[in-house]
Amino acid sequence: MFDTLFKSIFGSSNDRYIKRCRTRVEAINALEPQMQALADEDFPARIAEYREQAQNGRSLDDLLPEVFALTREAGKRALNMRHFDVQLVGGMVLHEGRIAEMKTGEGKTLVATLPVVLNAISGLGVHVVTVNDYLAKRDAAWMGRLYNFLGLSVGVIVHGLSDEERKEAYGADITYGTNNEFGFDYLRDNMKFYPHQLVQREHNFAIVDEVDSILIDEARTPLIISGPSEDSTGLYRRVDDIIPKLSPEAHFSVDEKARTATLTDEGVAKCEELLGIDNLFDPGNITFQHHVLQALKAHHVFRRDVDYIVTPEDQVVIVDEFTGRLMPGRRFSDGLHQALEAKEKVKVEAENQTLASITFQNYFRMYKKLAGMTGTADTEAVEFQQIYGLQVITIPTNKPMVRKDYPDSIYRTRREKFEAIVAAIGELHKSGQPVLVGTISIETSELLSAMLKKTGVPHNVLNAKHHEQEAEIVAQAGQRGKVTIATNMAGRGTDIVLGEGVRESGGLHILGTERHESRRIDNQLRGRSGRQGDPGSSRFYLSLEDDLMRLFGSDRISGLMQKLGMEEGEPIENRMVSRAIENAQKRVEGHNFEIRKTLLDYDNVMNQQREVIYTLRRETMMEADLEETAVEFMDDLFDEIYGDAEQGKGSEGDDAKAYAMARLRDVFNITRVLPLTDGQLPDRETARGAVLSILDELKRDTGEVYRDILRFFLLEEVDRCWKEHLLNMDHLRDGIGLRGYGQRDPKQEYKREGFSLFQEMLFRVRENLFRALTRLRIQREEQAPPEELKQEFKHKEEPKSLNYSGAQKETPSAAPERRGEPKVGRNDPCPCGSGQKYKKCCGA
């Protein structure tokens, strides 16, 4: 009540923000005559002048009016496009690190040039993030004319570039690319060996186009670089053969909401009989159990031409549920992709093991300043604020919106609904009004296409199978009498321009064949019509058999429709029913938000560990002399070995001193210079001196290559142990939910045990480093020249068999050796959570 009264008097916070921007818009407009008087060659000189002022301490906020005015004039001359006043406001929103919600056709691509130019002046680089390679190349070439006119350099990052080309693109003032390419380049940089191999600069400022698609829709899917693991392809085929012999309900049940399958007791017994094993739940048979559940999902949850397609080359390719695009190169996780390959009787590819991973949430939060643009963000404003700290500002349209959004037409069955859709399309086609038909799957678009062919209505189909003609089909969709069927239009990035005489016949009509589980995707489809004040209309056709209605809202809506007494083929258009559907969508959105938030909570634990490892790698790469680091690592190990001996800790069957001597032999190969024949543990300083003498001998034998040897072995061990650690964390994550049954918080347990595993991993790095160094011998009489030695100790090149995917990976492996209590090394992060190294905090 109070909020409503406050808004009626003072306006919403959004209105007040827009009002505050008007003063600066007037200041920019006042500078227009001054900029119009400049000669073309004056523009790069002005940018150089502003760059110098910024370097001398003048703030970008202070420079904003002049730079925006200069960019607006450059747009007129280079592109023949002038920024509207509302676009200037959009530019201010982006510069301040917020999200600008702008309707379709309001010129988001042009708006981005304003903050891009302003922030490029700093010389620290600006990243413009798009949803696909086509848009990255298109926008870089299109807006590049404006940037080049101003004397700024532009780079573009797309799939298939070499490291040299990527480095050059990142070195430009402005870099366009996709979210996947930026994320994978970050991960790849943290697998490199020498500083000159790094391609990315620091993460200064990013503008994310279609920000809702990238930061929300794709946030459930982490970026993963993986390599091949053990081959278990035969097992997938063996398990797939038994699935047709299992009966629904009797042997298994499917939860469509959660997209899971579960075996019944009878199903477990049947599987044991068919697989010829005694106990499916025996630890030795855990792999069978996992494969059976994945095979059930492949057969009864995932649908061909909806969730994936099979290409003419017999490859299973994922279909993006939000955009309808194919995602070649990405694979479902947890062996699900292999289960689908077995189901479709194509070649089953080997499983992969995670080498590096990050979520989009944590990648984009690394930027000093982050901003975004989209046509539909307001429905997710709370999530943007909570997770990314980004405020959504709705920018007014340049011309009033006149599109008519009609109420939903709801039918009892899918058959009735599709018959009504075909009839409606036929009527609209006769009248000359173009129709864009939105479907949520390839299966539906092809079904509708077949029905239209029978009635003789000419039409185009745009889905993941026909993406080559995408831009051409979309561009023609606004012509008189055109009928275009398209899977989800999110991120298509091509405006639909109305043809001659179309405005008079009502503009483009949007016909939705089903509600998506996200209101935002529905709004994106609607937003294709009514751009820049054009006329248009929209209507959704639904049935009680649609997935959303069936799973999330059917009982209540079905009851309402029975009360209203519907006849066969008769639609209902009722606001109460539409509200019930919207509430069902809100429930699904809330459910998906919780999934993303949980993913982030768990990834935050991994993120802290990732930062420590990547910082260690970066310091190892950059450090000219690693000898001091090696000695510190050695002292950490001595602290542990001699500390355990003093406290009487040993392994089973060994006394503490015997165990300490065994560790000295194993880790440091100490008997090479110090015999331990009398069974006495040498004092710490004697043992330390012995290890230093081994290192000194290695240093004398290798000369200047010694530093490269230290770097090589340290990076090798960090990478190998980190890879194993990622696998162990995957296993921990998979089983941690069960802790809830023991009245323990799974997230806290994951954090606690994850920290323990991480500390052990850091100690394994130190141990393995010294195992390698103290056993390395150089034959003096056959000693290689320094250059050959350098080549010998160069880091291995990136394996060619790496996979880049957007899903979590899990493969079974033996549990790591566990110590009783994790030790904290002096260079490790302090357990108190201060963020400092232990030696500078509690260990000082």
Swiss-Prot record:
One of its GO terms (molecular function) is metal ion binding. It is an enzyme of class 7 (translocase). The keyword GTP-binding does not apply. It is a peripheral membrane protein. GO terms for cellular component: cell envelope Sec protein transport complex; cytosol; plasma membrane. Residues 783-844 are annotated as: Disordered. Pfam families: P-loop_SecA, SEC-C, SecA_DEAD, SecA_PP_bind, SecA_SW. Part of the Sec protein translocase complex. Interacts with the SecYEG preprotein conducting channel. Has a central role in coupling the hydrolysis of ATP to the transfer of proteins into and across the cell membrane, serving as an ATP-driven molecular motor driving the stepwise translocation of polypeptide chains across the membrane. This is Protein translocase subunit SecA. It comes from Nitratidesulfovibrio vulgaris (strain DSM 19637 / Miyazaki F).
